[in-house]
């Protein structure tokens, strides 16, 4: 008698039935997106995910893992070179940075446990293009509101991502490069600017689009959640996890930390569980970025966190003052060096307000180091209270017992 083959089925195998039974608002589209990604995998494409750890890229990652787990468990012949690129700008909101680090650690463990053909690529700006070297080093000014060119975005994110991608692909046979598909979490409803940008490049959630990059090479992209609303995204995340009442499997127990952070830093309220009658409820509109960003008049998400829960997020008040100073310094010519940086063909240098004066740069550096020191003192105080039992021994307090940021290090 032949032995009977059997397979232990879990939520990763049966999630589609779970979605149908749960009557999720986004259930049908979720299944459709996973099937599209699965088809890309079967076609031998190499999927690159641009992952920030925000709600949209988190959703795309979740959808991709559903497709990849299906392929691996089915024994399908797929590329071993799928990869995730994550950019650490080194000047991010510390809450976002710490949450991203914890997610990436959990994702790494999940990839190893399930033997997935997926690599995590984490990149940081080079020393010369870092915010610290450019601004505190006196090489340039912050990217203020209405600037024609977003120098900070180019240096900290775009160039860094391109360099990391090129470095990874250099390890792969060049003939396979044309099979790389960049999967993005951009959505039309984020803003008119984002919608126009997607349309400019012919972005689609139904098929791959290919455009020439800056070097004339074909670059293929895919926008799986292009038409999704904020409510759709929260519907997906609130139903994802490994817990008993989660419909969609995930590498995380749940996405409560992401939901709570957006709720605390935004102008809307997160909807944990939605039905067809609640999709129009307010959703989280918070945007998170670098704590030194002056592309807007204020870091609204950080300020909202501080005012919402000073006991929890008040440690960021100091670095938020740096953002306010930078924003208010834009038209204060007393803060500028009067000697330009560019020498003309005739050998002249313009005398006009240019980068920050060395005295201002010294003050900014002193402020950064001081807030780094104060953060270390705060963390040490929490650690001592944990040891003496003055505060509860829980995940949050253990996390707060180590510095949440250090923006000036010995390597800088």
Language-model regions, residue ranges each:
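The Walker A (P-loop) glycine that initiates the GxxxxGKT/S ATP-binding motif of P-loop NTPases
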Residues: 51
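Conserved G/P- and acidic residue-centered "switch" motifs that form tight phosphate/ATP-binding loops
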Residues: 54
